[in-house]
Regions:
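Active-site metal-binding motif and surrounding structural segment of the metallo-beta-lactamase
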Residues: 67-118
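Active-site metal-binding loops of divalent metal-dependent hydrolases
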Residues: 34-36, 62-64, 91, 121-123, ...
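Beta-strand-turn-beta hairpins that frame and shape the catalytic cleft
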Residues: 25-27, 53-57, 158-165
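Bacterial Sec-dependent N-terminal signal peptides
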Residues: 1-24
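N-terminal-biased segments
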Residues: 23-37, 93-101
Length: 178
């Protein structure tokens, strides 16, 4: 595992348990989508992970492809239909692209699967470049709401579940360079 990826996981764990008033007894993070894959797993330009903490589960991002997260979960014998909450880190399609297909497929098994989607306030705002909206996630909002998704907006640090927190909106200091 490369150093950058290890540092990311360490940072994510610090965010999850670092702001807590209690102590997490059981924490597990399972990566379902990343650029690195082998054996029976699919890789893609995207990210998704299940965070499990003391009996609570939340899907952190949904990858970019329609099938990557669900196929990798199936390969790991993970039942995604029992995960009701999704946390979207930001609006890029490599972190949100799988959400519509996950909701469509899993709601037939469990109507609450992937139903509650935690997002930062302003995630659906237009991002204009040369007069065009380049925020692809904006176009997904109506589709997701028609599938029964309820968005939960966060602006400041908040506890989502016991010992699972969001930092809230992280201000952008510099324009994106990629």
């Amino acid at each position: 595992m490369n150093k950058l990826f290890k540092n990311f996981l360490l940072g994510m764990t610090t965010i999850i348990v670092g702001f807590s008033y209690g102590q997490t007894k059981d924490l597990k993070i399972t990566i379902l989508s990343t650029m690195v894959a082998d054996y029976d797993y699919l890789g893609e330009w995207g990210f998704s992970a299940i965070i499990e903490s003391d009996g609570h589960k939340i899907l952190f991002d949904t990858g970019s492809g329609e099938n990557t997260v669900i196929e990798n979960a199936d390969s790991l014998n993970i039942d995604l239909s029992q995960i009701y909450h999704v946390f979207v880190s930001h609006n890029h399609l490599d972190h949100t692209g799988g959400l519509i297909s996950l909701r469509k497929k899993l709601m037939t098994v469990n109507p609450n699967a992937m139903k509650f989607v935690h997002v930062g306030k302003g995630i659906f705002s237009e991002r204009l470049s040369e007069g065009k909206n380049v925020n692809g996630f904006t176009y997904h909002k109506d589709i997701l709401e028609s599938l029964g998704v309820e968005f939960i907006y966060h602006e400041k640090p908040e506890e989502i579940f016991p010992n699972i927190w969001t930092t809230g909106i992280v201000p952008r200091i510099h324009n994106e360079k990629n």
